[in-house]
């Protein structure tokens, strides 16, 4: 089996297990229960979770999604679903695991009969949400932080067209610089996953920094590109938030975001969560090079990337740079 296909299969299995929180196969009793279970209409609600009260956060890793989602999750009546990887589960398979010609094939499970399998994705998400949040408050909002599943953003938004979407953007040069620091031999990601790096299942940025920078730029283009595609196609409530604007005027940007999304929020409470999660309130021993909270300084890539690395990132991500940051393109 080709290495690429093998890696895709491994990712899909890991994603499914992580999403469903199971390690064993389905039992005979469970199979019988599933047979007896009535088929639920794809548009019905899951417990107290209303599809129109779901807010997705798509974009890229290292773009401030943890910060943004933490603030949103602290608002009364909001619940945070942190990285279910459901976008990665379906997106990796649909866009990377099979040839595009399969998408219109009559017998392919995610082929010609689109309404059927899109409806199944819808039920899959809502059933998962109901299982994970059994006591979800009536009228509450579910915030789904899914930057690393952005490759599946078009499928997620098609399955739940009533839901709302935040497209969180950050200069790809800063994203790559942050990723390189995290995956260097002294970085937090390396320390947390050291065995995977030593076994070769993850690549350290210290091994070949130039190749790593270009590779991360390609991943940014793929994931952020799909997130932008979903954003452009979505006909419901949506908002583009730039990390740089969030840093410069956090409270003002949060107010604009909630207003555009049509989500009511108490301004005093919003000010409280903004202050609570501010960069200044993060303990100093948790900030700095090699740590999860590194710089929070837009434009810091100028100090972190070599001219060659910056050029490579700009070349690879040029389509998105021109569209999202036209003022930064020479």
Outline where the language-model segments fall.
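Short helix/strand-capping connector loops at secondary-structure junctions
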Residues: 290-305
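Amphipathic alpha-helical recognition patches that constitute DNA-binding helices
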Residues: 56, 67, 164, 249, ...
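PAPS-dependent sulfation machinery
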Residues: 70, 74-154, 159, 185-211, ...
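PAPS-dependent sulfotransferase catalytic domain
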Residues: 95, 99, 140-268, 279-283, ...
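Post-kinase regulatory C-tail/linker adjacent to protein kinase catalytic domains
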Residues: 89, 273-280
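Helix N-cap/coil-helix junction residues
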Residues: 78, 263-265, 326
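PAPS-dependent sulfotransferase catalytic core
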Residues: 2-127
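C-terminal accessory extensions appended to soluble enzyme cores
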Residues: 304-330
């Amino acid at each position: 089996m080709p290495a690429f296909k093998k890696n895709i299969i491994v990712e899909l299995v890991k994603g499914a297990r992580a999403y469903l929180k199971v390690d064993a196969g389905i039992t005979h009793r469970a199979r019988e229960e599933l047979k007896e279970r009535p088929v639920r209409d794809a548009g019905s609600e899951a417990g107290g979770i209303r599809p129109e009260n779901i807010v997705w956060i798509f974009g890229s890793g290292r773009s401030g999604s943890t910060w943004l989602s933490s603030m949103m999750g602290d608002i009364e009546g909001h619940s945070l679903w942190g990285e279910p990887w459901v976008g990665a589960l379906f997106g990796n398979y649909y866009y990377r695991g099979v040839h595009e010609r399969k998408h219109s094939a009559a017998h392919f499970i995610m082929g010609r009969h689109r309404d059927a399998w899109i409806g199944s994705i819808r039920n899959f998400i809502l059933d998962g949400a109901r299982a994970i949040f059994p006591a979800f408050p009536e009228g509450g909002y579910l915030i789904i932080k899914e930057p690393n599943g952005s490759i599946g953003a078009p499928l997620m938004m098609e399955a739940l067209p009533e839901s709302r979407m935040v497209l969180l953007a950050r200069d790809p040069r800063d994203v790559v610089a942050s990723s390189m620091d995290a995956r260097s031999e002294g970085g937090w990601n390396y320390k947390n996953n050291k065995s995977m790096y030593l076994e070769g299942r993850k690549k350290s940025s210290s091994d070949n920094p130039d190749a790593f920078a270009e590779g991360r730029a390609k991943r940014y283009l793929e994931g952020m590109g799909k997130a932008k595609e979903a954003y452009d196609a979505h006909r419901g409530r949506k908002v583009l938030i730039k990390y740089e604007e969030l840093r410069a005027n956090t409270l003002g940007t949060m107010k604009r975001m909630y207003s555009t999304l049509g989500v009511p929020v108490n301004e005093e409470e919003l000010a409280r969560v903004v202050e609570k999660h501010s960069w200044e309130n993060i303990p100093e021993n948790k900030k700095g090079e090699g740590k999860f909270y590194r710089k929070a300084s837009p434009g810091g890539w100028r100090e972190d990337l070599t001219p060659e690395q910056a050029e490579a990132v700009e070349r690879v991500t040029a389509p998105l740079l021109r569209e999202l940051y036209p003022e930064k393109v020479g």
